């Protein structure tokens, strides 16, 4: 099956049925993919403020009604409890397990957040002839925790996370131009080259995802990453926090051209 050309609705059904379990990079070309954070309602306002204060890493797309399973605009026929290939369950800041269905954990008190994902702009990079190495190599995108603090909000504080795509400087400049039109899905890079300035000591050992080849004439190009809330959860320690597993996104019904400004 050609996942690249498949519709979001078809892919979500495959995920719901347990037939699609891997990362979603390169799927549903032209449609927005989203990071997912699900919290008890008492944490929702603080997290909403956290997103607004950190738009490069947590560009907020939508927030559900309390207890709702879907999103009227981004996925009216979706079910947030089943339509992500893999979820992470955090309790009091500790990663407890990964599951492929959260129906038994989701209560009428939960609020779901959709946060923009850089997978959304990857097809634009490819169309411009720019490399997206993790797609070339069939990997999940490499992601790294940094030493850069996020702007805190109530319970939520900690350092930001970044994703990385290797490019030449000429390609990085072109990628910056292209991604400047995708402000709702992380926008332009936050750093180019010198990973040690971000506190990254070994570029070949990402904290999430998989390492990719960096050629001799290339440098790492870093974008803000929606995995940031998972890092922040280690400090916030909410009694329960459910997220997507890194790289395993929620595929929305909205085309990226609707956000491309």
From Swiss-Prot:
It comes from the Bacteria. InterPro entries: D-Glu_cyclase, Putative_hydro-lyase, UPF0317. Belongs to the D-glutamate cyclase family. Its EC number is 4.2.1.-. GO terms for molecular function: lyase activity. It comes from Staphylococcus haemolyticus (strain JCSC1435). This is Putative hydro-lyase SH0274. Disulfide bonds: none annotated. Keywords: Lyase.
């Amino acid at each position: 099956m050609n996942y690249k050309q498949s519709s979001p609705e078809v892919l979500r059904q495959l995920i719901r049925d347990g037939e699609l379990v891997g990362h979603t990079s390169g799927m549903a070309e032209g449609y927005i993919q989203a990071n997912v954070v699900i919290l008890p309602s008492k944490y929702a306002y603080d997290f909403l403020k956290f997103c607004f204060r950190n738009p490069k890493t947590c560009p907020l797309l939508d927030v559900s009604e309390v207890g709702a399973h879907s999103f009227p605009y981004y996925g009216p026929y979706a079910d947030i409890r089943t339509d992500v290939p893999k979820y992470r369950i955090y309790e009091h800041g500790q990663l407890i397990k990964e599951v492929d269905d959260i129906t038994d954990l989701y209560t009428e008190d939960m609020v779901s957040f959709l946060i923009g994902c850089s997978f959304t702009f990857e097809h634009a990079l490819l169309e411009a002839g720019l490399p997206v190495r993790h797609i070339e190599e069939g990997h999940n995108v490499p992601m790294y925790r940094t030493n850069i603090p996020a702007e805190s909000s109530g319970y939520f504080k900690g350092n930001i996370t970044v994703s990385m795509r290797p490019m030449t400087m000429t390609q990085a400049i072109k990628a910056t131009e292209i991604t400047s039109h995708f402000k709702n899905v992380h926008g332009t890079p936050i750093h180019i080259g010198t990973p040690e300035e971000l506190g990254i000591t070994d570029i070949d050992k990402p904290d999430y995802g998989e390492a990719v080849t960096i050629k001799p004439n290339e440098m790492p190009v870093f974008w803000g990453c929606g995995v940031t809330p998972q890092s922040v959860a280690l400090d916030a320690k909410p009694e329960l926090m459910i997220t997507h597993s890194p790289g395993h996104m929620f595929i929305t019904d909205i085309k990226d051209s609707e956000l491309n400004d």
